[in-house]
Amino acid sequence: MRVYAGIDVGGTKVALGLFGEDKTLLGKAKFPADPSLTGEAFFRRIVEVLQSKMEELGLPWEQLQGVGVGLPCMIRYPQGQVVLCAMLPALNGFPVKECLEKLLPGVQVEVDNDGHCAALAESRHGAGRGRQHMLFCPVSTGLSSGIILDGKLFRGSNGFAGESGHTLVTPGAGIPCGCGNQGCIQS
């Protein structure tokens, strides 16, 4: 059996799910995100939890075929490198995909912004199924969005379309945001 992992990294927690080829949920785990860790230590911890969960479920490590990671960060896609991560600043500039490919040799790895991941999932398997255009706006520790146009994820000219949490609503005023600006809707 082939096994796939979906990993949702948030500002305060990490959630992962293991799925079979038929998209059946085999198991899941959730643990606190530790913002004090370096990028490498942060993702090494995720891989340790993933390995532990697979062992607990009796799934041989060799069955892991792919890992998808959504992060609350601006991601340079398809390279899978963090550009800016207001929620987890230790990840700024970190090459997530490269790190995971080293930790998970032979496993396909995809890394993207969590709003983009959620919009794609909702458009393919949720309330947006069959729709050509959709806006998905998840609200959690932060605020994000993902845009589906003509049935495809819209990334914009710089790849960061949908970063609605960092839209300036009161430029230079209000609570400072983790991105370095003041006046972001997220703050």
Regions found by a protein language model. Give the residues of each.
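Short glycine-rich, Thr/Ser-proximal phosphate-binding strand/loop in the N-terminal lobe
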Residues: 3-48, 81-84, 159
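Acidic active-site catalytic centers that drive phospho-/nucleotidyl reactions
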Residues: 8-10, 20, 76, 114, ...
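Short glycine-rich anion-binding loops that position phosphate/pyrophosphate groups of nucleotides
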Residues: 12, 72-75, 140-142
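Glycine/GP-enriched mid-protein hinge/lid loop-to-helix segment characteristic of carbohydrate kinases
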Residues: 17-19, 27-29, 38-41, 103-104, ...
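Glycine-rich phosphate-binding loop and adjoining helix at the ATP-binding site
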Residues: 35, 39-47, 62-67, 73-135
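Short catalytic/binding micro-motifs of nucleotide second-messenger systems
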Residues: 53-57
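A short alpha-helix-loop-beta-strand transition element characteristic
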Residues: 60-62, 156
